[in-house]
Regions:
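Anionic coordination/interaction segments
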Residues: 1-157
């Protein structure tokens, strides 16, 4: 369980990747909420603040991930990305799964969510204070490539 309860939910504007984003800090302290991404093509994407999603082209019949109601998307851990990071610290191997939805999480962490001001990019960030590492991933859409996910790992110590 996360032990950084003194951190409060807050909102602010931040610039990175040549774009301006609205940041919601400490989303782990909030119940999951639904977000959509704007698109200038036939791509649609609905995401939960916990990382689950549904997306596709044209309509629900062309869904890439199962098209479900928001309550089901919030609880499903099988719709969306999964990342497992192996870290060796002092000769000991540790596994970290950012945005793990399980109740038991052995690490102290902070989760932040960023949406750009155009509404067509969404960034998830988890900072692992125990292992001194952070993980970010961004969802965008592209008429040529479809749904695009990029990710980044940063050592914070």
């Amino acid at each position: 369980m996360n032990k950084l309860r003194e951190n409060k939910i807050a909102g602010s504007f931040e610039k990175f990747d040549d774009d301006e984003f609205y940041k919601i800090s400490n989303i782990q302290e909030m119940p999951p909420f639904f977000i959509n991404l704007a698109s200038n093509s036939d791509i649609w994407m609905y995401l939960s603040s916990n990382g689950s999603l549904t997306a596709g082209r044209k309509n629900a019949s062309f869904a890439v991930f199962p098209y479900e109601t928001d309550d089901k998307i919030h609880i499903d851990s099988f719709t969306g990305p999964k990342t497992i990071i192996r870290i060796t610290e002092n000769g000991q191997i540790k596994l970290w799964e950012p945005f793990d939805k399980s109740v038991v999480n052995p690490y102290k962490f902070t989760r932040n969510l960023y949406k750009n001001i155009w509404g067509n990019a969404l960034v998830y960030e988890e900072i692992n204070h125990t292992l001194n590492v952070s993980f970010k991933y961004k969802w965008e859409n592209s008429e040529k490539f479809g749904l695009v996910r990029t990710s980044c790992i940063v050592i914070t110590s």
